[in-house]
Amino acid sequence: LKYMLATQMAAPNSPQWFNTGLNYKYDLTGPQQGFWYVDPKTGNLTPGEDSYSRPQPHACFIQSIDDDLVNEGGIMDLWVKEARLFKFGSGTGTNFSNLRGEGEQLSGGGVSSGVMSFLKIGDRAAGAIKSGGTTRRAAKMVILDLDHPDIEDFIEWKAIEEDKARALIAAGYPADFNGEAYATVSGQNSNNSVKVPTEFLKAIEEDGDWDLIARTDGSVMKTVKARDLWNKIADACLLYTSDAADDLLC
């Protein structure tokens, strides 16, 4: 392994370079920041001693989210977990399809503001860590099922924000990615993906309808043409993303 690394025949992922061996070589520790490990002797899940004795070596994490605002496992808790991963150089991805769509009823009365309002909060948080993180820019993936009530807004999110950025650039703001135009708009800090089931592809072939389903009671909130929705995905990938393999994956 040493020979392969020294001759550049192979290389570990970024968090390995950032974190592995810092305690062994330089006696770095740092505060315990929520790290856990499986003790090889007991098999028990155990809190880590500090940040670097048992470091964070993995590049990617998949996290779940509950349809809850402030409790553990909910929306705001996810931003804290993402920040912890970003700080030590890892990326994270989450399917947000559990969150209710815009207009769905809340248990305490009123209606939900929808998944997009919370995605924009997470996008801003990632953007801040991208600028001030200790290792590299934040990297995250956002996934939404194709039957989510807010799927159309999700598909067009980056396209609309890109139009805003172009308008600002045309007005004289700098066009570089770190400039004021792109810092002003949202949706710039994640790869967005849609989860496409086989049933949807069959609906495209048959020119059929596609139902958007409420998360609270399973009722149909809206029905769209499958081909129209598919064309929105294609347009967003073709016209407004830097790499269709990275954004709005199908």
Locate the predicted segments by residue.
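Extended catalytic cores of very large enzyme megasubunits
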Residues: 1-246
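N-terminal low-complexity segments that are often proline-rich with Ser/Thr-Pro
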Residues: 248-250
